[in-house]
Amino acid sequence: MSKGKVLLVLYEGGKHAEEQEKLLGCIENELGIRNFIEEQGYELVTTIDKDPEPTSTVDRELKDAEIVITTPFFPAYISRNRIAEAPNLKLCVTAGVGSDHVDLEAANERKITVTEVTGSNVVSVAEHVMATILVLIRNYNGGHQ
């Protein structure tokens, strides 16, 4: 018997997930946390089915989940209605930054902790900006055509 349920809502990586194990944010690679979660005695349920509310897999599984983890680019919207239907929910985690997909007022009323992985993409954002600057300065797109 498990201690509780962790619900993971991620996008489908398809062939890219098979080719690249480091593509962690997809359902195939499950943020790389399945073994850890199960070793702690929890059940991990992973889905891409987050809409429509209230008939999705998220709605069915959230009813008895203690933790929900989602990403900022494929978020499961944790609305007041979903929170009301999830009496065991204690923690909403964004595997990235931002929490605008969680009804913070409803979470606060229920004393549900809402957290994110602040700083997780600082380096990659800086790298992207530098690469974009180089593309623009060197007229890469014009030269490529």
Curated annotation (Swiss-Prot):
GO terms for molecular function: NAD binding; oxidoreductase activity, acting on the CH-OH group of donors, NAD or NADP as acceptor. Coiled coil: none annotated. This is Putative uncharacterized protein YPL276W. Substrate binds at V97, N121. It comes from the Eukaryota. InterPro entries: D-isomer_2_OHA_DH_cat_dom. Belongs to the D-isomer specific 2-hydroxyacid dehydrogenase family. FDH subfamily. Transmembrane segments: none annotated. It holds the Pfam family 2-Hacid_dh.
